[in-house]
């Protein structure tokens, strides 16, 4: 990774670090589960990964703004992600390792 790339990605990495710090320190004290899937902190990490710092933070702020009794919650994926990405599935595996096709 070049120095230019490192500087470009630094704000995103700092934001992700703050989210991880929140998850390790403050979140366990709150105790109440998130009404959304994925959780707000997981949503924020995915938004930062896919959209970088500025757009990722904007999406996160919009998501946190939905957190209240006026919104029913539910599944709310980061734009441009799939359900597999939301579930953190790195790869879909095929149970048939023989290579035979069953037409």
Curated annotation (Swiss-Prot):
Protein family (similarity comment): Belongs to the UPF0161 family.
Main localization category: membrane
Name of the protein in question: Putative membrane protein insertion efficiency factor
Known function: Could be involved in insertion of integral membrane proteins into the membrane.
Subcellular location: Cell inner membrane
Cellular component aspect of the GO annotation: plasma membrane
Alphabetically ordered keywords of this record: Cell inner membrane, Cell membrane, Membrane
Domain of life, source organism: Bacteria
Entry membrane topology: Peripheral membrane protein
InterPro entries: Membr_insert_effic_factor_YidD
